[in-house]
């Protein structure tokens, strides 16, 4: 959306409208798979994200209804993205966010020139819902029910931590224990995490007890708990490969067990619940339970929280607080901005 808005010199309002449409598609499509696409080995960031990006691109290109349908059909035929990266911490995890956006623009531009695609790309017997679902476990009603009236993306989450969104619950619980009880990491005997089945599948496979790189750290429940108790936080500073060989971190990882909680599994995927219990060397136990992690629409962050997160990350990248504040000021009045390319000039000029 930002790339096309830059090249087409679209206004802030144009950008907001296009992104809203794309976000609605990705949320509805993801919901239709009932939380199970992962079990089929597909990566929703890529598979659902490409369909969303093609709608955003079509809107920015000013395509009519028929050509927007073509764009969806073309994009659906180009969808890809496997979860294979998860066992090796492969960088294809990153690729599967940018690659679908690139292909979505290609799909929309092809449609703009009259190249057609299947109009029933979602519901066809050989379409996306069947092909990418786990054992045909999907519900097509979520694609169109209340479309244009009930904006489902307004209930999507904002990530608080620089790692997998499924990590939010147990990290919130760990840091709640830290804030309330101030346990010394050296005195922790063991850590137990209760979670849903898929969260375990993603973050607590046996290989997650031996992380090797930064991507692994972002998808390792034992590491995240260990470093949260050691450092009392989980920021980009904790995504440091030096910690992999830290003796205390290694001991805490080895002391961590993860078990499925039947109630949390029943509530998934509507809720990403988690609970953490630590046992100290003197036998004292501390527990925290999180129904909905921070950033969920039922446990929301504030706009200021989001801005501060951006400031923290942008200042690390740019080393220039003046530029960071210029970006914040631009976005604060995004709906009144006549030319999105001005924002991209601020964002892209990294030296």
What do the predicted segments below correspond to?
Residues 1, 50-54:
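Short alpha-helices
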Residues 14, 92-102, 109-351:
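Terminal-appendage/accessory-domain detector
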Residues 18-25, 71-75, 194, 330-331, ...:
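Short acidic/histidine-centered micro-motifs embedded in hydrophobic/aromatic stretches
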Residues 45, 77-86, 197-205:
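Short, surface-exposed loop/turn segments at secondary-structure boundaries that line and modulate
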């Amino acid at each position: 959306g930002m790339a096309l808005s830059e090249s087409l010199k679209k206004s802030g309002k144009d950008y907001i409208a296009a992104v809203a449409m794309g976000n609605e598609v990705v949320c509805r499509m993801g919901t239709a798979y009932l939380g199970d696409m992962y079990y089929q080995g597909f990566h929703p960031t890529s598979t659902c994200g490409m369909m969303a990006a093609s709608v955003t691109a079509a809107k920015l290109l000013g395509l009519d209804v028929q050509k927007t349908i073509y764009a969806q059909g073309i994009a659906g035929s180009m969808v890809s993205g496997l979860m294979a990266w998860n066992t090796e911490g492969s960088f294809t995890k990153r690729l599967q966010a940018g690659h679908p956006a690139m292909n979505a623009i290609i799909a929309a531009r092809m449609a703009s020139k009259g190249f057609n695609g299947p109009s029933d790309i979602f519901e066809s017997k050989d379409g996306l819902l069947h092909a990418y679902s786990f054992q045909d476990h999907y519900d097509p009603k979520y694609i169109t029910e209340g479309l244009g009236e009930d904006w489902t993306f307004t209930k999507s989450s904002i990530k608080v931590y620089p790692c997998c969104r499924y990590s939010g619950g147990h990290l919130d619980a760990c840091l709640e224990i830290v804030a309330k009880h101030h346990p010394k990491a050296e005195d922790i005997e063991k850590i137990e995490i209760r979670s849903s089945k898929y969260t375990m599948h993603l973050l607590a496979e046996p290989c997650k007890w031996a992380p090797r790189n930064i991507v692994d750290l972002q998808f390792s429940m034992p590491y995240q708990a260990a470093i949260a108790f050691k450092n009392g936080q989980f920021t980009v500073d904790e995504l440091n490969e030096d910690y992999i060989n830290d003796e205390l971190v290694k001991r805490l990882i080895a002391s961590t067990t993860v078990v499925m909680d039947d109630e949390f599994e029943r509530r998934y995927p509507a809720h990403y619940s988690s609970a953490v219990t630590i046992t100290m060397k003197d036998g004292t136990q501390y527990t925290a339970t999180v129904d909905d992690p921070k950033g969920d629409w039922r446990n929301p962050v504030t706009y200021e929280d989001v801005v501060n997160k951006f400031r923290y990350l942008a200042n690390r990248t740019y080393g220039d607080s003046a530029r960071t504040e210029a970006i914040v000021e631009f976005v604060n009045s995004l709906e009144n901005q006549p030319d999105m390319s001005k924002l991209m000039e601020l964002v892209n000029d990294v030296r």
